Structure formats: C-alpha cells, structure tokens
Swiss-Prot record:
GO terms for molecular function: ATP binding; UMP kinase activity. Pfam families: AA_kinase (PF00696). This is Uridylate kinase. The lineage of its organism: Bacteria, Bacillati, Cyanobacteriota, Cyanophyceae, Synechococcales. Homohexamer. It is an enzyme of class 2 (transferase). It comes from Prochlorococcus marinus (strain NATL2A). One of its GO terms (biological process) is 'de novo' CTP biosynthetic process. The keyword Nucleotide-binding applies.
Length: 237
C-alpha cells in the first residue's frame, strides 16, 4: 500500500544532525531530496517541524521563564526551521508553502485548512510552523491535529532512532524494539513516543503513527510505500 497523503513530524533535533544546536544544511538537503522523490511519485506531503534545535519551551520554563512565554519563543523557532526547510525543498525542485499558526505575513501564509489542502492537491509540500498557535501544546500534538484536519492517512514521526523501544537503546544494549503497538499500549504503559494528547488525537481519528530513522537515506520512500519499517502504532496490533 502506498499512502496518497501523509504528514511527516520532523523534530528540530533531526535538523541539527550531529551539531550541538542549530541547523545542518547537509541534513536539510538530504531530507529535501528524499521528500522530492515521494512527491514525484504522487504522494501529497505535509510537514510539521519542531524547534528543539533552537529553543525548547519546557527547558525555558524549567530555567525560570514563564511557561507561556517560553512556548511562544519555541513556536518562533519552529517557523525559522520551516522557512529553512522550504528553502531546501525548493532547491530540490519541490514547490513548497509555509503556513504559520502565528501571523507572519511577510514570510509565511496564515494557517488556513482549505488552502493547505488545495496546495497539497496541486502537488505542493506544505510545511506547518508556529505549532498550533497556543502555548502548552507540543509540536507532536500539532502534528496529530494537522493530520486530522487535512485528512492525512498516516503520521510519520521522523527521528534519530529506528523505532520505539522498551527503554533507551542508547543506554541499554538489550533494549527491545517494538514492531507494532496499539495506541492503548502506548497510553497505558506511558511509552514516550509522543505526548498523550497527540496519541489520543491519532487514536480517536484512526490515524496510524509510524516511527522511523530519518537519517537512513530512502527511509521516507520506504515508509510511504508501506514497507515494514520502524515501529507502527495503530488501533489494532
């Protein structure tokens, strides 16, 4: 099965590659190249990008900032990443639009659901920045929300690891990878794939989540084509 419309949740950390912070241009171009291939094959792609490579609201809050203020700074960071990703995609030959939940007319369209869907239908990639426009919500929740709004068939969570494990595979060599999980498993066992709000949104709207390693070239195409890759979370195991 090849998905016809998919949403990719791309963490800010993925964009920084091996750097301690910021953006690695080579990573951006690699991701753009992989996305261009699936767009050429007819799949409609939307992307929600995080901002943790620049600023993370929870860390700012822990350091003494007002939580809402810290979250707004984090939302601005996601727009910076979205514009950078747009540049990379367009240099790879992919027409791309950035839509921001926070109004920034000079650099991004406002988020308008029907316009976003129309862009997708025309073969453009839509990158959503600004989170969902409200503090206290993660970009994972934004990904689940936007996926439901644009009728995406699947959410791909593109990360630095090749799936979901019972514990941190970087710390424990005997960590076990899950090939399939149910949403109920994730919620009941508090498995840290996404926050519970994002998981519940996908569960209620019957949108499966596939977690895979973005740094393996060709993985986006494999995921889009329905190949068994990473870990799949759905309503049935």
């Amino acid at each position: 099965m090849t998905y016809s419309r998919a949403l990719i949740k791309l963490s800010g950390e993925a964009l920084m590659g091996d750097k301690p912070y910021g953006i690695d241009p080579e990573i951006v171009q690699s991701i753009a190249k992989d996305v261009s291939k699936v767009v050429e094959n007819g799949t409609q792609i939307a992307i929600v990008v995080g901002g943790g490579n620049i600023f993370r609201g929870l860390k700012g809050s822990a350091a003494g900032m007002d939580r809402a203020t810290a979250d707004y700074v984090g939302m601005l960071a996601t727009v910076m990443n979205a514009i950078t990703l747009q540049d990379g995609l367009e240099r790879a030959g992919v027409p791309t639009r950035v839509q921001s939940a926070i109004d920034m007319q000079q650099i991004a369209e406002p988020y308008i659901r029907r316009r976003a869907i129309r862009h997708l239908e025309k073969g453009r990639v839509v990158v959503f920045g600004g989170g969902c426009g409200n503090p206290f919500f993660t970009t994972d929740t934004t990904a689940a929300l936007r996926a439901a709004e644009i009728n995406a068939e699947v959410v791909f969570k593109a990360t630095k690891v090749d799936g979901v494990y019972d514990r941190d595979p970087k710390k424990f060599t005997d960590a076990v990878k899950y090939d399939n999980l149910t949403f109920q498993d994730v919620l009941a066992n508090e498995i840290g794939v996404m926050d519970s709000t994002a998981i519940a949104l996908c569960k209620d709207n019957k949108i499966p989540i596939v977690v895979f390693n973005i740094f393996q070239p060709g993985n986006i195409a494999k995921a889009i084509s329905g190949e068994p890759i990473g870990s799949r979370i759905s309503n049935s195991s």
